[in-house]
Amino acid sequence: NSNNINLSYDDQQRLIYSGTEQKYPTSNQLKSYPNGLLNPFNGTNFMHPTIQSNSLITRHPNNNSFQLNTTNDSNNNNTTNNGNDSRSHLYDISTFNAQNPYSLTNTLNFNSRTMNNQLTMNDSMKLNGNLTLHDTNYHALLNGSTSFGSTVFRSLVNSENQSYLNSSTNMLMNSSLDNINNSNDHSTLNDNNNDCIGQSLRQSGNSSESNVVVYPWMNPKGTDISVDQKRTRQTYTRYQTLELEKEFHFNKYLTRRRRIEIAHTLTLTERQIKIWFQNR
């Protein structure tokens, strides 16, 4: 302990932790995990199962980038180059596929026919230079296994059938115009028929009104009085109004005997006296 006093702080820390250096792994060493557990230090555990294949993703030896391999020769060259790299397991997923039950076994197969169809997509999707087909199943119908659907679909695309398409559209337009004309004619006929029916009904109504006998009991009560004979609003003279106001000042409610006396004095009917007091 006395010797450690003369040492610097860094030397003392180095002596204290000199025996524990082997307890912790270095940064370039990864722990091994049993089957079925994810390795958090390996990025391939979080990759989608569809891209975890030996023949799909490898590390380029020069620029540390990933590329696609389609042949077995490229896989062999890649394994030899990765042997020189101490951290090849961070880029190559060949060791992970041995434990991963979801590894992809099928390799990518590039079909020349599919590539040619993709290159000529714009030309094949044009119908006679004017009409463009936007259906996503267009190429699937052309390259499908069913012969009936492909032949029918190809026949519609060929330029020799343009006359058929034009004739069909013309027929549709002509039929629609004929339908419009027929509907107009039908509407005019209906209008004329309605006018004729209305005139005949009016004529029959006039004739029936002149021939029908109306008895007194058929009319409602009071309809026998003409417009001139209807009761008009009663206008009271100043003298009548004055006498009625004096009577109302003394008696707000009249008896029938007093009402008859006032009506005889003011030359009014008993009903008129009653209505005036009710309104007052």
UniProtKB/Swiss-Prot annotation:
Family: Belongs to the Antp homeobox family.
Name this polypeptide is given: Homeobox protein SMOX-1
SMART domains: HOX
Biased composition annotated in UniProt, kind: Low complexity: 69-85
Compartment annotation: Nucleus
Gene Ontology cellular component list: nucleus
Positions of the DNA-binding region: 229-280
Organism ancestry: Eukaryota, Metazoa, Spiralia, Lophotrochozoa, Platyhelminthes
